[in-house]
Curated annotation (Swiss-Prot):
HAMAP family: Ribosomal_bL27 (MF_00539). This is Large ribosomal subunit protein bL27. One of its GO terms (biological process) is translation. Belongs to the bacterial ribosomal protein bL27 family. It comes from Renibacterium salmoninarum (strain ATCC 33209 / DSM 20767 / JCM 11484 / NBRC 15589 / NCIMB 2235). One of its GO terms (molecular function) is structural constituent of ribosome.
């Protein structure tokens, strides 16, 4: 059997692109509507008040305010606390 596979052939050359997942805005940070809060695969964090979920499970702000992480029914949830008419 050949120990070399042949001309212009390789078994290497594969690498996946980084996915840049994780929490992008942490608790207490102020966000605007549309800002991404968490990039994730699956619902590690669930959307709460003022937070939407994209088709790839990305959580984003639906309104301006401060990010708040908490729990509801044994699930980790992300809420937006709207600032009281400070603007």
């Amino acid at each position: 059997m050949a120990h070399k596979k042949g001309a212009s052939s390789t078994r290497n050359g594969r690498d996946s692109n980084a996915q840049y997942l994780g929490v992008k805005r942490f608790g207490g940070q102020v966000v605007k509507a549309g800002e991404i809060i968490v990039r994730q695969r699956g619902t590690h964090f669930h959307p709460g008040a003022g937070v939407g979920r994209g088709k790839d499970d990305t959580l984003f702000a639906l309104e301006a305010g401060a990010v708040e992480f908490g729990a509801r029914g044994g699930r980790r949830v992300v809420n937006i606390v709207v600032a009281a008419a400070a603007e």
